[in-house]
Design a protein with these regions (language model features):
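Rossmann-fold dinucleotide-binding core
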Residues: 110, 133-213
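Rossmann-fold NAD(P) dinucleotide-binding segment
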Residues: 91-151
Length: 322
């Protein structure tokens, strides 16, 4: 019997060629994988699948709006070619025959992506919304997807996608979460069901980000100021004495790197976190301030300095942060 991974990655074949009954053939026809978006997360997942399942596990296609931008199209086509992915010109082309669809765009484009692709989803296809969005945003996307006859699943990616790639921990929720978990496990992914309601997985992700991304923003505000004041060594020594379980210098350098490389994407996520807090009837002051810091540093587009806190802080402080 074929593994779930093989089933999810099988190439479509016409019933006339295979001689299989129509119902079985339809299942085979809808067994390809598609991604909406082909950035860091999608490429990490696909490279992991390719490594685990062999050089040619089957058909994977993608639609990414960068294909419509002449300045970004070439890099997208090269990335797809490197990983054996069909780069579609339209959502309809990407989703033809796709029984499993991963939405992997930025948080601020997730609802737009669902709106654009919903009509092209196959009936009963799994739409795995892996974007870092508020429960309300995911619920709105779910209505669009399910109105088109597909199956919406809330997926939260709970760690950076590197180095784990497709083995990054995932939380899933929704009425078809168990079905989605089986598909994900079959692809060698680390998925766990956390509930049968849309929004449960994303709530965990969103509220965790208050702490994780907020800590990054606090790091920037504290240590950039300390570096400019010339007292960063004393501040770090005090932090180390207060909480020796953290290597504060190393963690601060890492936190700045995360913001420098991913700040724009993290800012979009933190706007969704702020929306989540408001939906819960709570103030969003910390989340909104975190979004501001993430965006300020991410928009600097600094070439990553050496792996040292001082070099990274200096590279940021050379720019205008006001």
């Amino acid at each position: 019997m074929a593994s779930a991974a093989e089933a999810a990655l099988a190439s479509p074949t016409s019933g006339r060629e295979s001689g299989l009954p129509d119902s079985i053939e339809e299942e085979k026809r809808m067994s390809a994988i598609a991604t909406i978006g082909f950035g860091e997360a999608a490429q990490a997942f696909v490279s992991g699948w390719r490594t685990e399942n062999g050089a040619s596990p089957g058909k994977i296609s993608t639609f990414d709006i960068k294909v419509e931008d002449p300045s970004q199209r070439g890099d997208l086509l090269q990335a797809c070619s490197d990983l054996g992915v069909d780069c579609a010109e339209t959502p309809a082309q990407a989703l033809t025959g796709a029984g499993t669809v991963f939405s992997l765009v930025t948080a601020d484009r997730a609802l737009e992506a669902a709106t654009r692709v919903a009509e092209f989803l196959g009936r009963d296809a799994l739409y795995l919304d892996c974007n870092s969005c508020s429960p309300a945003t995911k619920a709105a996307a779910a209505r669009l997807v399910e109105a088109a006859g597909a199956v919406y699943v809330d997926v939260a990616v709970m760690s950076p996608v590197h180095p784990a790639r497709h083995r990054s921990p995932l939380l899933v929720s929704g009425s078809s979460a168990e079905r989605a978990q089986d598909v994900l496990l079959g692809l060698g992914m680390q998925a766990r069901t956390v509930g049968d309601e849309i929004g449960q997985a994303s709530s965990i992700k969103m509220l965790r980000s208050v702490m994780i991304k907020g800590f990054e923003a606090l790091t920037a505000e504290c240590l950039l100021a300390a570096r400019r004041a010339g007292v960063e060594k004393a501040v770090l020594a005090s932090l180390q004495a207060s909480d020796p379980g953290i290597d504060w210098t190393m963690r601060a350098a890492y936190n700045l790197e995360r913001m420098m490389v991913h700040g724009k994407r993290r800012a979009a996520e933190m706007q969704e976190v702020a929306a989540t807090l408001r939906e819960l009837g709570l103030p969003d002051r910390m989340a909104s301030a975190t979004a501001d810091w993430q965006l300020r540093i991410g928009e600097l587009d600094i070439l990553m300095p050496e792996n040292s806190l001082e070099a990274r802080a200096d590279a940021i402080l050379e720019r205008d942060l006001t």
